[in-house]
Amino acid sequence: CHICGTCRLSNGSVNSNVTAPVHIGHGVICDDFIISSGSKVDDGTMLTRCFVGQSCKLGHNYSASDSLFFSNCQGENGEACAIFAGPFTVTHHKSTLLIAGMFSFMNAGSGSNQSNHMYKLGPIHQGTMERGAKTTSDSYILWPARVGAFSLVMGRHVNHADTSNLPFSYLIEQRNTTYLVPGVNLRSVGTIRDAQKWPKRDKRKDPNRLDYINYNLLSPYTIQKMFKGRSILKELKRVSGETSEIYSYQSAKIKNSSLNNGIRFYEIAIHKFLGNSIIKRLEGINFQSNEEIRQRLKPDTEIGTGEWVDMSGLIAPKSEIDRLLDGIENGSVNRLKSINASFAEMHENYYTYEWTWAYNKIQEFYGLNPDEITAQDIIRIVKAWKEAVVGLDKMVYDDARKEFSLSSMTGFGADGSHDEMKQDFEQVRGDFESNTFVTAVLKHIEDKTALGNELIKRIGSIQE
């Protein structure tokens, strides 16, 4: 542990160790606190009644009270009050306030804030931004509200919308009204980049990792919401009519084109996830008959059906979380080590449980009977998967291209000609085709196409 120039540390625990030392620096004031291994609290940070998880970084006069920060959080310049900051909650800006909310994998834009007080019965309201949600500059949410996973919040939202069943959406304010664009973030280059960067930014060096983190963008947790979202959008269309210009949902408005695109985006993601699961399940085995395929498809456990939850980084079946809670209530689980061991077991068995869930959804979505599935059914699913993966990658590719458009070059080549502006842009940003992200997308299309073709070839000759 390294403590240097600190103003006050009162009534706290510093859980440092040799593999992941804690650094507490100049001007820091902490009262009633716990700081976990590998964390750095520096430069005038003020903490009151706070828990700081592993490998967090708090600095530049950050101020927090009554809050929990789990692993790999970053807080600089701004303020937090009564928040549950799950892994990778990041706020960098002086004018940003996070208050009375639950967040994880979240990036707060400058000037983002929320209100939990409506000047009636006091500050009693709270809200949730599910994993991967982010806010733009000067965004505002009046709690209570719930923002769906991997959604983007832009503008001021005061109507208490719950969009948890419409993940990967944009929430945009126009003339004091929340407009919802469902599923559009699935094709965003930013979403894919986020998913790639989080594992790389895991700074934990402590061999005893306290948080179990699942980085999967598509999981039973998000796909179950897409199934619900697809049903919601189809029902809105049925009730209000296909020709309606605007649909109303949860005090938000959805344009006709956005609704139809939302259904399409969710179906693409469902095809992608279920196809991924089936390819993974059948990989590396030479099947001789349809019966062999059916036997391989059968799940290894019954655990995994039903609802799934995000436990601040850990994605698990709700049935397993309920089983743990029952154990705590009846006294059979009475040690923190036992609770942690349960979480570890859920995390380790994620793919086993995931397949149980996916197997049931494959039957439901594709209308298949488990006793009658044939190689031809699998080929049909894999072809739909291939179309979904390539289609989504092409959308991401087109989204990335916008970053290399003429309008993106504005601001380069300070006072030169149009050609100098273009040259300056290319010197700094490179050209589109050689961009590392773009080449990765093209390789992904190639690899996934080959993967699908390999399975089709492997089982294509099975007739019986």
Placement of each model-derived feature along the sequence:
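Terminal amphipathic alpha-helical/low-complexity segments used for targeting or macromolecular assembly
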Residues: S164-E464
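Glycine-rich hexapeptide-repeat left-handed beta-helix
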Residues: L9-D32, S37-G241
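Structured, charged N-terminal subsegments at the starts of enzyme catalytic cores
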Residues: C1-C4, R8-L9
